[in-house]
Amino acid sequence: MKTAYQHTKKGQSCFLRAGLLMLLVLFCSVSGWAAKQESIKKKEINKSFNVGKNDILQVDNRYGNITVTHWSKSEVSIRVVIEAKARNDEKAQAIIDRVNIRMEKMGNTVSAVTSLRSQNGNGGSNESFTINYYVNMPSELTCDLTQKYGNIIMPENNKGKCDLHVKYGNLNGGNFTGPLSIDVQYGNMDISDVDNATLDLAYCGKSSIRNGSQLNIDSKYSNLSLGNVRKMNTEAKYGDIHIDRLDNGYMELKYGNCKIDELKQGITVDELSYSTLTIKDLASNFDKVNVDARYGNLNIYIDVNASFRVVANNMKYGNCKV
């Protein structure tokens, strides 16, 4: 009986090994079959245009990135790379065929626009595509760039006028010595130094400018970090602002907080509603701090050598402590 029992166990062991081997072979076969289901198709479009100092570049793209680099040529070169992924070559090619890129020069405007033809049926869950623009242009050229569902990446030094629009993506750039207009929604922004900039921010988790000479800011549901700012005009709602150093400013702040580490000259706050403004270091030779606060808090740390007068008019539901 003992020998028969051992023989039966060996038979079961062999059977289990054979079964596991069959499952392993089947798994490898299925994995190999599944891996073959992804097909990748690419298409590249290249065009170049001669430009002068008064020309304008306009790019309107979606589902990808716009990456700009500068060169010394009086020419704009645009390379568009379209990449589609699908279960088979036919479906990947169908995605490529949906994408239309129109590039032309009319008058003094070079334009490149992405459009998508309507899709036949519903796309599969494992289908995707990207449309990436790579632009070479003179640094002094005026540009108007719009990117939806993707990012705009600008070079280190930008000398021309720039209008930059990003929705559902991020904006990254270096220094801007020409007029700059920025519109970012549902994304982040990181800029180095600017001379004159207008910012329209909405639902931006993190936005930053290292240094600014003149800033005009409209911010909603966004957080903004600024370095050294000479002059700023700001309207902010539902978000926080941090400024390292400010010379002079005007502000309306609602349902948010603003912290200024160092204020050199003065600030006028026409409305401080359900918000807190904190000035950590007010220069001893400051000019004026004028704040209209309604259900808000104002905290100012003043140099011990400063000479000043406090005027608190029409105070309700609050205290003034010096």
Give each language-model segment a name:
Residues 18-29:
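Bacterial N-terminal signal peptides
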Residues 2-5, 14, 32-61, 65-147, ...:
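Acidic (Asp/Glu) and glycine-rich low-complexity loops/linkers
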Residues 222-298:
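Eukaryotic tandem repeat interaction scaffolds
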Residues 142, 152-154, 276-279, 298-300:
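Beta-strand-rich extracellular passenger or scaffold domains
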